[in-house]
């Protein structure tokens, strides 16, 4: 059984895979694989578990190269065109948003997603914590969308939208 002091020590710092991902070296999953491959050392000792928490004072190396410190948190606006999938990879081989970004951009994450046939503002960030905070419905932030409809929908067709519809357990109003 964990005591409060032991629990505090375990929770200090961040998981090493998260720190590697935050530094822009690799995704969290790729960082976990790099760790399991024995390529990561913390304070000179090779580690084989991604469960290790590290503090900012710890020296992390990958293949004996010191991991750079994480860059400042940034947020970019991207005007997503129709026809791109909001994903890092698409199992169907379709073009993804990340294929369209400038090569000079650091590794970024999309905040939410837009459907393949949708266009408009997509936020990108280099910080997974910010991404999660912006995506969570519990933040209570109002999201507004502008929708274009092809043709002229009838009142009967629009009535459910005017009454509000449930999407992902949330009541949405127009």
What does each model-identified segment do?
Residues 2-172:
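Basic, flexible Lys/Arg- and Gly-enriched helix-loop patches that mediate nucleic-acid binding at interfaces
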């Amino acid at each position: 059984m964990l005591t409060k002091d032991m629990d505090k020590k375990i929770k200090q710092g961040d998981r090493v895979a998260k720190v590697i991902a935050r530094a822009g070296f690799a995704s969290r999953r790729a960082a976990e694989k790099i760790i399991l491959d024995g390529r990561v050392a913390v304070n000179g000792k090779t580690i084989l578990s991604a469960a290790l928490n590290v503090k900012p004072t710890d020296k992390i190396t990958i293949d004996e190269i010191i991991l750079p410190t994480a860059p400042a948190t940034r947020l970019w606006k991207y005007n997503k065109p129709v026809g791109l999938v909001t994903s890092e990879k698409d199992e169907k081989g379709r073009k993804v948003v990340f294929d369209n970004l400038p090569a000079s951009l650091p590794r970024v994450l999309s905040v939410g997603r837009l459907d393949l046939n949708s266009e408009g503002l997509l936020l990108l960030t280099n910080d997974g914590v910010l991404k999660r905070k912006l995506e969570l419905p519990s933040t209570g932030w109002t999201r507004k969308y502008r929708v274009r409809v092809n043709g002229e929908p009838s009142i009967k067709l629009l009535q459910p939208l005017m009454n509000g519809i449930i999407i992902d357990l949330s009541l949405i109003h127009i």
